[in-house]
Each structure stands twice: as C-alpha cells, then as structure tokens.
Amino acid sequence: MDEGQKQQFIKLTYFLGEVLGEQYEIVFHVITEDGAYIAAIANNHISGRSLDSPLTVFASELMQNKKYLEKDFLCDYKALVGKSKLIRGSTFFIKNHDKLVGILCINHDTSIMRDLICKMIDLEKIGDMGDILGNISFSQNDSSIETLSHSIEDILVQSVDSSYLNSDYQLSITQKEEIAEKLYEKGIFNIKGAVPIVAKFLKISEP
C-alpha cells in the first residue's frame, strides 16, 4: 500500500466514525512486510484499544489462512471486549490484486440497545426473554469469535497454556517448539512487533 492509499483509508476511517456514530468503532490496519499495525482508529472507547494495540488473533488467522483470497469481506461475527462484553464485528479486506495490504474493521456496540430491550422485557415481566435475546442475537456465524486485545502480551495469554506463562516455569525445547508452531498457525507473527516479544517469552534469541 502506497502512502496516498494509506492516507485515503485513514480519512475514510474517521469519516465512517463520524457518520455511523459513537456505537461504531472503525479500525484500519496496514499490512506490511514487517507485520500489521493500526494506522487509524475511530471511537476507540468501545474496545479501549489504541494505535499501539496489535492485530487480533482472529484477524491474524484470517491472514495466515489467506481467507482474503476466498472472500472480499466478512460480516456480523462475534467480537469480545474484556471478559463479557459482546459486540458485532465486520471486516473488509483491502487488496492490491491478490495481495492483502490492509484491513478495515467495523465493530458495532449493541450493548445499549440490548440493555434497553432487556429492561423493556423486564417491565413487561416476560419470563426469561432477556436471556433468550442474549443467546440468539449472535446466531449468525456463531463459530467466529474475535477478542479485541490491547497488547501482544494479551494475545499470548489467550493463545498459550496459562501454566507456561508463569515466570518460574522452565519450558523444554519441545514445548518451545510446540508453542512457536501454535503461534505461527494462528498468524501471531503477522503482527508487527510480535517476534521480539515471543522470543523474550520463550527465552530464545530472535531469528
């Protein structure tokens, strides 16, 4: 992606943030040879992320599996903020021919609307409809769940057995190889800055 194209998508990111409103987070990722990074983010109060936050594991796997060669975009999948807040996510693949050069993500925070509906249901005393609403609202593409992480360290916590994260735990060579292979399969090394952090965690030198 050249600088001119990059600047156009940065402007588009903030434009969509203004047009769609505060319940929509817009995130523009640039994909380079050095990895992916956030170039612009609008309404980031929804996830709490910043320009320094990494690409998500979900998006990294899409890159690693070259999903962008099969589809131009993905719509209406689950995205998780923190431990319990569910929002709706959609991803548009920015391609120069068949080469992925960027990703534009739109995350819709429906929590206010959902809370309002649940309160209305509660006022009407309609049994457990609030729980039913929570269960069916993400029925489409239910198998796809994205976690919006603030740092590469957060991604390691999601991806690696928690017992290995103990600083006193001594990883064997086999365990290090297995962890590195798992992170590769998830596309973690597509994230800019991931290699030195993973190398430090595994206590190995950078390749």
Annotate the PLM regions.
Residues 17-82:
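Structured interaction and signal-relay segments at domain junctions
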Residues 8, 86, 190:
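Short, glycine/acidic-rich beta->alpha junctions
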Residues 2-10, 15-19, 102, 108-169, ...:
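Juxtadomain coupling helices with adjacent low-complexity linkers
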Residues 90-93, 124, 157, 173-181, ...:
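Conserved mixed alpha/beta catalytic, RNA-binding, or beta-rich assembly cores of soluble enzyme
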Residues 62-123:
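Sensory/regulatory domains in signal-transduction proteins
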Residues 19, 23, 27, 163-167, ...:
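Short secondary-structure junctions and interdomain/linker hinges
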Residues 172-207:
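Phosphate-/nucleic-acid-contacting segments
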